[in-house]
Amino acid sequence: MRFSGKRELIKSVQRELGILADGLDGPVTWKTIYDQVKGESEKPSSSSIAEDMVNLAKSEIGVSEIDGTNCGPRVDEYKAATWLDPDKGWPWCAAFICWLVREAIENKDVDFKRPQTAGAWDFENWARKQEGKGVALYKPVGEILNRQDNDRPYIRKGDIVVFRFSHIGLAIGEPMSNGHVATIEGNTNGAGSREGGSVLEKSRRVSSIRSVIRIS
């Protein structure tokens, strides 16, 4: 195709690409353009904190403490994300969430201070202090159970869910039609105990949730 000023335009593009500016749209020019476009399309997209937390949590499924001690090589790493002594044995469901947040925000520019609490319900206090900084607390839980429009808060994938029985986990999907939500939790077991000793995927009744914390 020919048009006035075509050669100068091609030269300008070639200079931007860092190749010989001869004004000819030959194979070298087109290959350079193709390689640059291909490279841009293959760059990984930046993921959200919630997405990173879910992916991290899934990769930790199966981690267990040693002999019911609330301790173990990986478990102690979770506990080190809190302000308590990781070498001592104590319930670590909240520590697991602290660890997920810490790892997910690494190399990300965030306004909030990361949680370091070992208490499940104390996560609500942390969230209140960080509201307006990329953290939102939804409580009472009745406000979030039934989505009616796009503006209504709702349990989403990557939300931190605080349970009524002093336990905490991470939602890995939206509530299902059976009234349950899939979660990944630390310090639980097959029976759903809050002191079960492993990182597992669970299905919890939405009615057992007392609050939801969303990080954006």
Regions found by a protein language model. Give the residues of each.
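Soluble non-cytosolic domains of exported or imported proteins
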Residues: 3-8, 24-27, 47-51, 87-95, ...
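Acidic helix-start/capping segments at beta-turn-to-alpha-helix junctions
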Residues: 25-31, 74-76, 120-124
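N-terminal capping segments
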Residues: 38-111
